[in-house]
């Protein structure tokens, strides 16, 4: 059923080659330069395990109420695509998939950032007031703006 899952996405074009953009997505250490959630908790605890980048690279965090707690793992990494398994443990439990699709265009790279996942009953009821689009959409927009700035100034 369509209402039992969600998909949100945002897109932008970045004046940088695909490989430069890919390098910022494929290495969780690089996310500190552009992630829209960076700065929610100045005392955020970060843990990196697995390879430094690419498939099986893992980033886990634990922070204040705003930052929450969770874990991300890169599950696919190809020249024009990076997929991430995203598990939130707090403040709300959720298991989502994040995809970055990179398309070469004249003068740079077109980037689509999407997030998909199931919506439990509570999320569907909350959706009557606050949709995932409204909750997460602005974060994706902010992240793409910061990714663009970071890639273009590298």
Q: PLM features: what roles do these ranges have?
A:
Residues 1-52:
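Hydrophobic ligand-binding cavity/cleft-lining segments
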Residues 2-4, 51-53, 64-66, 90-94, ...:
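A generic structural micro-feature
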Residues 7-9, 67-72, 93-98:
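Short, surface-exposed coil-to-beta transition loops
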Residues 20-31, 59, 74, 84, ...:
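Hydrophobic pocket/interface hotspot
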Residues 52-60, 77-85:
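Short, hydrophobic/aromatic-rich segments at coil-to-beta transitions
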Residues 57-74:
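Short hydrophobic interaction/assembly module
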Residues 74-76, 104:
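A residue-level detector for short acidic-glycine micro-motifs
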Residues 81-142, 147-149, 153:
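Beta-strand/loop substructures that line and gate deep hydrophobic ligand-binding cavities in soluble
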């Amino acid at each position: 059923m369509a209402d039992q899952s969600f998909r949100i996405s945002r897109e932008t074009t970045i004046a940088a080659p695909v490989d430069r953009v890919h390098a910022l997505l494929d290495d969780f250490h690089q996310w500190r330069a552009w992630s829209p959630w960076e700065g929610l908790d100045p005392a955020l605890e970060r843990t990196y395990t697995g390879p430094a980048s690419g498939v099986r690279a893992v980033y886990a965090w634990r922070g204040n109420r705003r930052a929450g707690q969770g874990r991300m793992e890169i599950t696919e990494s190809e020249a024009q695509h990076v997929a991430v398994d995203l598990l939130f443990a707090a403040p709300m439990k959720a298991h989502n998939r994040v995809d970055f699709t990179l398309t070469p265009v004249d003068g740079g790279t077109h980037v689509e950032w999407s997030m998909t996942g199931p919506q439990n009953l509570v999320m569907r009821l909350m959706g009557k007031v606050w949709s995932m689009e409204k909750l997460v959409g602005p974060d994706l927009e902010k992240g793409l703006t910061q990714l663009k700035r970071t890639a273009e100034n590298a």
